[in-house]
Amino acid sequence: SFLAKHGWLDLEQYEKKAEDQGSAEHRLLYPLRPLSVSAPSDHKNLLVVVVDSLRADMLNNINMPNLQRYADNHFNFRQHMSGGNDEAMGMFSLFYGLPGHYYGDIRADKRPPVLFDEMLRQDYQFGLFGALEDAKQYRQSLLAGLRKQVFVSRQTDDRRLIDDWQQWLGTRTADRPWFSLVYLSSPGDYQVPASIKGPFQPELTRFNPATAYRPENLQKLENRYKNAVFYTDQLLEQMLTQLQLQGLDDQTIVVVTSNHGQEFNETQSNSWGYGSNYSTYQVQVPLVLAWPGAEPAPQAQASSHLDLVPTLMKNMLGVRNPYRDYSTGRNLFEASTRTWLLAGDQNDFAIYQGNTITQFNKQGDFELLDRDTYRPIKHGTPDMGTLIQVMNELNRFYRAP
């Protein structure tokens, strides 16, 4: 391949060497050093709401008026990318602050995120809401360190899920900080209660994958999605109001984001939904952040799911280590000179830099694409300086073979 030919990249060969050294447990060095922590005397609560398949362009006054109003009064990261283009990579990058390249080894090692470990050490109550626990992938990664029963509700009906969350909020132990993850699935499932007629019409009344993607149904499919998003916006308003009513909004960090985007064939490549390419339609998502005591300011710089963990570890939990000890992200509140963002899984990677997307795989094959059109850039060559930085990030949490 082009990159291997330049003598410094063949991830496959590197991985094979590393595998010969033994199991994931001996390969993975995460975190790189033990954590040094100055825990705060006054703990903030943490609410993370992940809305399945929420496109970045849905955060506006028409599709999500409630969340837009909330975003206007808090931190709204408008150039925000997930760390992947599917559910597993989106959630992994958000809670580990690591590229998806490490996912297989984290799972093999059943290594929980340092964020969760540290919250447990600081006596946070965990309340998780959504249909996550059934997936083996989460039991071997995100949830691996959670011995106690922390799943309060596995409802797939979002309204009931919110009811369960509100009940939990009212009955938890008042003198301990809490962490709550709420996973809302309506947009990804095109789900709207039958009793609700959404404002976007005409819509597909029933989502059938066999017929939904026909050209004549495109507008109806998009409207169905927009109605599910609009419905979700009302549920978010209900949650945020509940925090206020219980007097918790000034003690609670709130994060609203998504696992990945949702494409409606904008790339003209018969791509629908997620997981099929690294266009911004599938990877760019909203990130709205409320942080008690912080003065909101417009957020113009590009940000990534990889940045949430460093921000929470330092500013919420008092971790003193450099971010590089446990993440490839940076603190959202600190100015950055970073010129690129990374998304990907265990095999494929995408670097977002200016108006270019550089995609490459473990074999070292690469392609340059226009960020807006997702069309190949002919005769383009990758930015070698950036690729070397990225390769370092993809390897530095492994022991050298």
Set out the residue ranges of the language-model regions.
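Histidine-centered active-site microenvironments of extracellular/periplasmic hydrolases
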Residues: 244-293
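Soluble extramembrane regions of membrane proteins in the secretory/endomembrane system
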Residues: 232, 253, 259, 347-348
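Structural scaffold positions in well-ordered secondary structure
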Residues: 70, 94, 119, 182, ...
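Active-site-proximal alpha/beta segments of enzymes that process anionic O-linked groups
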Residues: 1-209, 329
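Membrane-interface soluble catalytic domains
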Residues: 22-24, 29-39, 134-135, 241-247, ...
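Extracellular/periplasmic catalytic domains that process cell-envelope and extracellular macromolecules
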Residues: 39-42, 119-121, 172-175, 248-249, ...
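A short beta-strand-to-alpha-helix junction
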Residues: 106-113, 219-231, 277-283, 294-310, ...
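A long, amphipathic alpha-helix that forms part
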Residues: 11, 163-170, 205-252
